[in-house]
């Protein structure tokens, strides 16, 4: 960890449900000293209104400069957070959003780079693993300075679901979801533990709990977004707090280990793809990935997830408007 400057600046691109919830989380938690909110021209006044509304909470939290921003404001930002994109509708998978959101992502990243920005990108728009890869390609940045929210929310859901079943605090449950933030994600059961006790051993002392319940629990975690979208139209609170946690780790140079969408350089037998795994993150971005030794079944799931993402990337970047970036 290194000494960090006192004034931390975040630019948020996208003031929809996720973006505005993230901004609210930053204000509530006293994260960053400056927050600029960028929206498309026809929604600029909404960003102005949200900035004003959020500023009225500052007397209860901590000082912060909050305003509706423009892309030139990215020049001296420490972090640009991208939540903008077409929302996932009922019946859609995250991967269905690829075509719509790649073009949006290219426009955003191009304008951020033109400002002279040299900080860190944090991507949350879906499909997040694909769009993190796209941000890396469109920006030309080193891979360690481009981070996706990855399986951070999935992991939080997993820990909370286990905690509820076991009647313990979720913060005492240590377990990860890895792979795609989506349908091919998987639970790393082999290393799940409660306060250091292997989950399998811990369950021996828990009555009326069987293996089938674990399968149902994981499926509930994997499909949680669909459940929420069908009931209320979108998910935003959980991912907003996950983004706030990642933001704090970066701005405070914590060297925290978080499950993120990070660049693969042979860690699990594949390259040139961003996918969810634990990684050390601090002021300069990804310090290094943390490679959990997966069992054979988990390795197969990780490789299948990566293969699916790679196929989608190759198809998407074969299109003329994105092909030049793919060759860089």
Curated annotation (Swiss-Prot):
Name of encoding gene: ldh
Primary enzyme class: oxidoreductase
Quaternary structure and interacting proteins, as annotated: Homotetramer.
PANTHER family: L-2-HYDROXYCARBOXYLATE DEHYDROGENASE (NAD(P)(+)) (PTHR43128), L-LACTATE DEHYDROGENASE (PTHR43128:SF16)
A single GO cellular-component term on record: cytoplasm
Organism, scientific name: Streptococcus mutans serotype c (strain ATCC 700610 / UA159)
GO biological process: glycolytic process; lactate metabolic process
Binding, NAD(+): 18, 39, 46, 71, 85-86, 107, 124-126, 149
Catalytic center residues: 181
GO molecular function: L-lactate dehydrogenase activity
CDD domains (alphabetical): HicDH_like
Keyword terms: Allosteric enzyme, Cytoplasm, NAD, Oxidoreductase, Phosphoprotein
Residues the entry annotates as binding substrate: 88, 94, 126-129, 154-157, 235
Main location, first listed in the record: cytoplasm
Task of the protein: Catalyzes the conversion of lactate to pyruvate.
Classification via InterPro entries: L-lactate/malate_DH, L-lactate_DH, L-lactate_DH_AS, Lactate/malate_DH_C, Lactate/malate_DH_N, Lactate_DH/Glyco_Ohase_4_C, NAD(P)-bd_dom_sf
Pathway: Fermentation; pyruvate fermentation to lactate; (S)-lactate from pyruvate: step 1/1
List of residues that carry Phosphotyrosine: 226
Documented EC number(s): 1.1.1.27
Protein's recorded name: L-lactate dehydrogenase
Disulfide bonds: none
Binding site for beta-D-fructose 1,6-bisphosphate: 159, 174
